[in-house]
Design a protein with these regions (language model features):
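Structural recognition of the conserved hydrophobic beta-strand(s) that form the central parallel beta-sheet
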Residues: 89-95
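P-loop NTPase motor domains
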Residues: 1-88, 103, 173-180
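P-loop NTPase motor core of the ASCE superfamily
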Residues: 7-8, 15-16, 78-81, 99-178
Length: 181
């Protein structure tokens, strides 16, 4: 190939789609896809800055399915922190958050922290369930009413109302899934 036929830097110039298809069983060429992603983000940021005053004319949405199977993209923790302002968004798809942690080690928290949303389609991996429950869903305030009645020489009745904090969904509730809720 004597010329650039992918033209990764021009993805934000007009409406277009680009697909990378790789084997999910043979990892031989995964590094090429990781390299292409790295190059694409760098070229698009450079083009946004140098040609369009900091923002691409067309939003570039990267839907990166099976992100754990493409290999590590160098500097992804920095890329995810700066692309949004340039009209580039990134959605990473993992089977479990531990895949991101295994691939990016200490930088996985930075990467996940720069994601503005999460879609969880189910799973049972404990650290993923805990992270979703504690860090993504958070807590809710619930009201709990207790009543008591005692009988003896004279009957007494008590009613108590308390406000308590609890996880919006516990790990057990997340694990059950929507079919049982």
């Amino acid at each position: 190939m004597s010329y650039d036929e992918l033209e990764l830097d021009k993805l934000g110039d007009e409406k277009s789609a680009l697909f990378f298809l790789i084997s999910d069983t043979d990892t031989t060429y995964n590094f090429l896809v990781a390299l292409a992603f790295s190059q694409m983000f760098n070229l698009l940021c450079e083009r946004a800055d140098n040609t369009y005053g900091g923002r691409l004319p067309y939003h570039v949405r990267v839907l990166w399915d099976e992100a754990a199977n493409t290999g590590q993209v160098p500097g992804l923790e920095k890329i995810v922190a700066v692309i949004r302002s340039r009209e580039i968004s990134l959605t990473l798809f993992y089977q479990a958050m531990s895949q991101c942690k295994a691939l990016y080690k200490d930088h996985s928290e930075t990467i996940m922290g720069n994601m503005d949303s999460i879609v969880f389609l189910g799973g049972r991996e404990a650290s993923t369930l805990k992270d979703i429950s504690e860090n993504w869903l958070g807590k809710a305030t619930i009201s709990m009413q207790t009543e008591g009645r005692s009988r003896g020489q004279s009957e007494s009745y008590s009613q108590n109302m308390q406000r308590l904090g609890r996880e919006l969904m516990t790990t057990s509730e997340i694990k059950i899934g929507r079919a049982h809720v």
